[in-house]
A protein has these predicted regions:
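Secretory-pathway ectodomains
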Residues: 1-281
């Protein structure tokens, strides 16, 4: 039996330390981390997305499952039961991201814009929240369109940032407890942006890439928004209009603005890394 200690995993360009052991009987197999799951590189079989002391959580395109380390499935949740969407007839919803465990429930976000909580012991549905218009008149609790969802470790609540809406979902109350349009809250700051992309939760802030109202569909700006104070606290024009006109260089959604310590990092479409030193904001 092979025992391998997993010490560092790279995920979303951030280093996460995990002090867990992965045990597998075949000593010839190699494991690596990809797409939020442990993967056997020879069979492409997914192992565990979340590893606890005596069980793991994993998912495929069709099911989310809880299993112990003796290959016993404790429960399975069929993703087909979440329903389809009028925008993609015939397609089944899939998990976009497993967010975390809070108050005895496991939360995940789906491709069709749904936020779902399952009872960790039974796999039963505890809460279903949706911003998908297809879910009106259904068992989903409707809210404004959910965007990028983040699990906040400090209070185990979930933060959603969409194109213009900010929401907090209280995982204990199982309810949306805060919701506002940040363009309306800060019209002279973040309200000057036509669109924002790739928000990243960073403590009391979220970072973003943005297109100003006067721009023409290309991303040149980055910014930091204080979601508690509800105001833009910093912005910067990374790519000038002149540079874009000459080189067509721009920022792209797959390369968000990262904050690490007092440094900010963002890459442009030409793979240039821009580094900023963050002062008090």
């Amino acid at each position: 039996m092979k025992t391998g200690k997993i010490e560092v995993i790279i995920h979303n360009a951030q280093i996460v330390s995990i002090n867990k052991y992965l045990i597998y009987e075949d000593t010839n197999n190699v494991f690596h981390y990809r797409n939020n799951n442990f993967v056997d590189v020879f069979s492409s079989k997914y192992f565990f997305n979340i590893v606890e002391d005596n069980y793991g959580i994993t998912y495929t395109k069709t099911h989310l499952s809880k299993a112990n380390f003796q290959d016993e499935i404790l429960w399975q949740f069929p993703l087909s039961s979440l329903g389809g969407t009028e925008y993609e007839p015939g397609k089944t919803d899939k998990i976009d991201k497993i967010l975390g465990i809070a108050h005895g429930n496991i939360w995940f976000y789906t491709d069709f814009g749904r936020l779902v909580a399952l009872d960790l012991e039974t796999g039963d549905v505890v809460k279903k929240i949706s911003g998908n218009p297809s879910d009106k008149n259904s068992t989903y609790e409707m809210t404004l369109g959910l965007g990028d969802c983040f699990f906040r470790p400090l209070d185990k609540n979930i933060v959603s940032v969409s194109g213009f809406d900010f929401q907090i979902i209280d995982t204990e109350q199982l309810a949306v407890t805060e919701q506002y349009d940040f363009r309306e809250a800060d019209p002279m700051g973040i309200g000057t942006y036509r669109s924002i992309y790739s928000p990243m939760l960073q403590g009391d802030y979220f970072t973003f890439l943005g297109i100003k109202e006067e721009d023409f569909g290309y991303i040149r700006w980055i910014g930091i928004f204080d979601y508690k104070a509800r105001k833009l606290v910093w912005e910067y024009e990374v790519i000038s209009e002149e540079e874009f006109d000459e080189t067509r260089n721009q920022l792209v959604p797959p390369q968000p603005l990262y904050m690490s310590g007092n440094k900010l990092y963002v890459k442009d479409i030409k793979d240039n890394l821009h580094i900023f030193e963050r002062e008090d904001i």
